[in-house]
Amino acid sequence: MSDDTGDVIDELFAVIEDRKANLPEDSYTASLFTHEKGENAVLEKLGEETTELILAAKDDDTEELAHESADIVYHLLVLLSMKEMDIDDLRAELAKRR
């Protein structure tokens, strides 16, 4: 695993938080925070991406598996932000599970 994986996730979360605060009109991320379905829009995306991940795994399609995994991580980070949580909350929970 690359040493900068944590940095990439931290950077992505910072972008998500910025989009949440500033709500640029042309931002997919901002649209998730203002969607008429609210958090259900993100929950639906997580369900959809999880199904796609399962199918990629069953097909042994590692390229698609990586793509769908990234989609899940992204939407999970959006959900954490919606719930006023952050990366440190996730890190703390993962640390408990070592």
From Swiss-Prot:
It is an enzyme of class 3 (hydrolase). Pathway: Amino-acid biosynthesis; L-histidine biosynthesis; L-histidine from 5-phospho-alpha-D-ribose 1-diphosphate: step 2/9. It is found in: Cytoplasm. Its EC number is 3.6.1.31. Its main location: cytoplasm. GO terms for molecular function: ATP binding; phosphoribosyl-ATP diphosphatase activity. Keywords: Amino-acid biosynthesis, ATP-binding, Cytoplasm, Histidine biosynthesis, Hydrolase, Nucleotide-binding. GO terms for cellular component: cytoplasm. Belongs to the PRA-PH family. PANTHER family: HISTIDINE BIOSYNTHESIS BIFUNCTIONAL PROTEIN, HISTIDINE BIOSYNTHESIS BIFUNCTIONAL PROTEIN HISIE. This is Phosphoribosyl-ATP pyrophosphatase. It comes from Haloarcula marismortui (strain ATCC 43049 / DSM 3752 / JCM 8966 / VKM B-1809). The lineage of its organism: Archaea, Methanobacteriati, Methanobacteriota, Stenosarchaea group, Halobacteria.
